[in-house]
Amino acid sequence: MKKIPVFFINGMLDSGKTTFIIDTLENDIKERKAKTLLLVCEEGEVEYTNELLERTNTYMHVFESIEDFDYKFIDKLIKNEKPDRVVIEMNGMWDLSKLQFPRVMEIVQVITFIDGSTFNIYFNNMRQKFNDIIKKSHIVCFTKLENPEPLAPYQTALKLINNNAQFMLMDENLRAQDAFEEPLPYDVEADIIKIEERDYGTFYIDTFDHKERYDGKTVEYDIMVVLSDKLPPNTFIAGRFIMNCCADDIQLFGFLANNTLNKPLKDRQWIHMVANISYEWSEEYNEEELVLDPISIELIDEPKEKVLDLTK
């Protein structure tokens, strides 16, 4: 069965979804005469004109509610219109887990638009909704911001939600730039990279984004030991529990560590560790993973806040 590519454009009302789709249709028609099936789940101030739809070879259907978004009906639309691609302008308030799609559809890209001018208010009050949206996104575009500075405090929280996504800042002319440019809060050029408690999330994310900064380096920080029968012999996870959204969303973020010092460690024990960093191929994750080889381990008291709370 030949799959039809689906481009999923998500986000809240008036965040720039329609403007982006119109620009995409306009640019694509210059290169090819592909037919587009446009499924609109939310109508804002910007509208699709009949002239645009006809000129760009686009058939549009508007869904008034999530109950109307029926996969059998969509399947009929596909059979009748025979599109080369499907573009979905999603309603950001809909529960995506309740949506079903015909088997012929294949979602190839999810782009989420967020109004940067109100992001801090909505993110602090609707964090679970943003979590759900961002987790499924390939690209996250912030609009209505002149510079990325207001986003800097949220960099770690957003990347912990989905570190595989590209976070972009898009201006009114649809020109894009990286959303995050803030300097690291620690010195990666130091002989020993010292990580403070508040900076652990930033460190964790950056080791994936910039492996070249850390490979062969030495790190020092306070961390929790996690033991498991599922780990290779004489290894442990050096990690921390982080709350990025709410109490139900607490997750462990850590790295595999070799117990090269043969320390008698206990599960959930806290240690002060200095360790060498290397990257080794992981068959489980099919990519290089950071591995720690301790130089020194000292037992310490557990911190007052065992869970690193990024919601504050």
Where are these regions (language model features)?
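Nucleotide-sugar donor phosphate/pyrophosphate-binding loop at the beta->alpha transition
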Residues: 122-128
